[in-house]
A protein has these predicted regions:
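Residue-level detector of anion-binding/catalytic polar loops
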Residues: 37, 107, 184
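N-terminal helical cap/lid subdomain that shapes the substrate entry/recognition surface
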Residues: 2-96, 102-104, 115-117, 128-129
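Conserved SAM-binding loop
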Residues: 16, 90, 108-111, 167-168, ...
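Asp-based, Mg2+/Mn2+-dependent phosphohydrolase catalytic module
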Residues: 1-7, 42, 102, 115-116, ...
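Gly/Ser/Thr-rich helix-start
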Residues: 15, 50-55, 94, 110, ...
Length: 221
């Protein structure tokens, strides 16, 4: 389906790695520090893709317009910074997927809404990312996804035309950004979403239930 592709770009959390345990732990520590009971990790998991907003929403029912949100957010960031590599791992099949891309000589990179403060040290700490051509964070350009600017910056950095790139993500904003950047788009219907989640209205070029299925779309192996 994507035989003419020269590069693959990925979202990070929920697409390549499962960071929900560390994100949830950072928020839950804030509860226990205040004498509140711990919440089960399963409560945090569905909102892991929403970052601090999602985690504080679960932990405290707090929305971004709350007068203390910025204070709580920075505390959450400090907690997460201290634990972000403790329980985070690649989704099943991702290590093999990346190995196949490397073997085929396809360039690949990451475009995430995670700020560089976290995205850069996290990816440096994981061997999975040693062959990534670029890591673009949510604050690398003036705009985050769903704006296409981060994807276009990633394509520019690796020297591949956007039309020759595939972007893979697990959120509708990923598909919106990819389409706006004129890239092929793939919805990752695994990870945080689960196989029962309906992604049809995202209008991605394709949907995958496992990382291996991306190789099939790329006509690999």
């Amino acid at each position: 389906m994507f035989a003419s592709v020269d590069a693959v770009m990925f979202d990070l959390d929920g697409t390549l790695i499962d960071s929900a345990p560390d994100l949830g732990a950072a928020a839950d520590q804030m509860r226990t520090d205040r004498g509140l009971p711990s919440l089960p990790p399963a409560d945090y998991r569905p909102m892991a893709g929403a970052g601090a907003r999602g985690m504080l929403g679960v932990a405290f029912g707090m929305a971004p317009d709350h007068h203390d949100f910025e204070i709580f957010k920075e505390e959450f960031f400090r907690n997460y910074e201290a634990c972000m590599t403790q329980r985070t791992y690649a989704f099943k099949g991702v290590v093999d997927l990346i190995a196949q891309l490397d073997q085929a000589g396809l360039k690949w990179g990451v475009v995430t809404n995670k700020s560089e403060r976290f995205a850069l040290p996290l990816t440096r700490a994981m061997a999975l990312f040693k062959t990534a051509q670029t890591i673009v964070g949510g604050d690398t350009t003036p705009h985050a996804k769903p704006h296409p600017a981060p994807l276009l910056e990633a394509a520019r950095r690796i020297g591949v035309a956007p039309e020759k790139c595939v972007y893979v993500g697990d959120d509708e904003r990923d598909i919106i950004a990819g389409r706006a950047a004129r890239m092929f788009t793939v919805a990752a219907a695994y990870g945080y979403l689960g196989v029962t989640h309906d992604t049809a209205h995202w209008k991605a070029d394709a949907t995958i239930q496992t990382p291996y299925q991306l190789l099939q779309l790329l006509r690999m192996p």
